Amino acid sequence: MISIIVPVYNVGSYLPKCIDSILKQTCGDFELILVDDGSTDDSPQICDSYKEKDARVVVIHKQNEGLVRARKTGLQKAAGQYICYVDGDDWIEADMIEHLSEKMAETGADLAASGLYCESEDSVQKLHGKLEAGIYDTKEILSIMLYTGEFYEFGVSQFACTKLFRRDLLWDVQIQVDDRINCGEDVAVTYPYILRTQKICISDYIGYHYIQRAGSIVGCFDSDEYDRNKILIAYLKNIFDRSAYAECLLRQLNQYAKNLFLTRNIACFDVLQKDEILMPYGGIPVNARIILYGAGKMGQSLYRYLKGRDSIEVVDWLDKNSAVYQKKGMEVHCPDCLEKIQDKAYDFLLIAVNSQKAVKSIYRCLEEMGVNAEKIKWLREEFIREDYFILDAFA
């Protein structure tokens, strides 16, 4: 049997589509466990209505304690030998669970992993890890599972919801996750779980639809973000420290930590600086005039930081998908606007993208537009190469 666990918290408008997609699964024997994590909308009633109509549905109502506790609660109730997680505001293709379970049966793998569609109102993006489809002995991929060596690429994607787990291996991994973790909950499960496997199966199949909700992303920022990120990194460091492969795992974790703080709290790199900021970029004068290129997670992190400093002037914020971000209430413009901005109107153009491959393409485009190459800045090579730049803080 397969247990599909769905943590639910105030997702009433999305939940029916999620549940319907699961109940239409083509695989034979499965149960759906809905864990209502103290919802205050109509989610509890929706869960109960499905339980009344379908014997495969199990509903648990509990007080709000977060995603980690909700997953633990669902796992404790699960009767299946295999576990799949689905978020309550997402949905899956009808053959997803069957595909993953067949892969595990055919290969004898301890984990089956696939990709997902990241969907917003205006775009759909396919997301996979870097590893090609195939069967891997775990020892083969440990050195690149979290970081391939190119900033920033995952070897195996972090998403728990695109994977099928063995319950007996998942139990200890999930139960020991620090309940305080509410950032990177998937990372806290996926990679510690892989350490317990012998063989994993990577599929190029995509059957999971991750839905990005409407609304301004820039506004979604908590003052305790840095502390929450530190809890996650410290938790993973403790696990990796005890592994026989600690050296290569910690090296990857360091790179992941850099990426995490770049995209969520870039200010942490400048704690001891006075005359310059953005040390990952090699240092930018505190009174500089900046054009920001990139409005994804890293761009939003950087924009928040710069707008919070009175001495910095953000001349413009650019992204080729500006129309998408404008609908979310963000003041982002098309890169073509650069042609109207005089060279003397700004000091630096900062590329706020965490993909080394994408940066190379952006550099070429900017140079073709006549942007002064000396003004274009991205992460300095020393910052990317340094193996223990971040983890020294978690000694």
What are these regions (language model features)?
Residues 83:
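Short aromatic/hydrophobic "clamp" motif used to bind/position activated sugar donors
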Residues 262-395:
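Hydrophobic, well-ordered beta-alpha structural blocks that scaffold small-molecule cofactor pockets
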Residues 198, 205-213, 219-247, 264-281:
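Catalytic core of nucleotide-sugar-dependent glycosyltransferases
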Residues 88-203, 208-224:
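Donor-binding/catalytic cores of nucleotide-activated saccharide
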Residues 20-29:
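Short, acidic, metal-binding catalytic loop of nucleotide-sugar glycosyltransferases
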Residues 21, 36-45:
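A conserved acidic beta->alpha catalytic loop
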Residues 62-78:
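Glycine-rich, basic loop-to-helix element that forms the pyrophosphate-binding segment
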Residues 29-38, 58-63, 87-88:
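Short beta-strand/loop segment that forms part of the nucleotide-sugar
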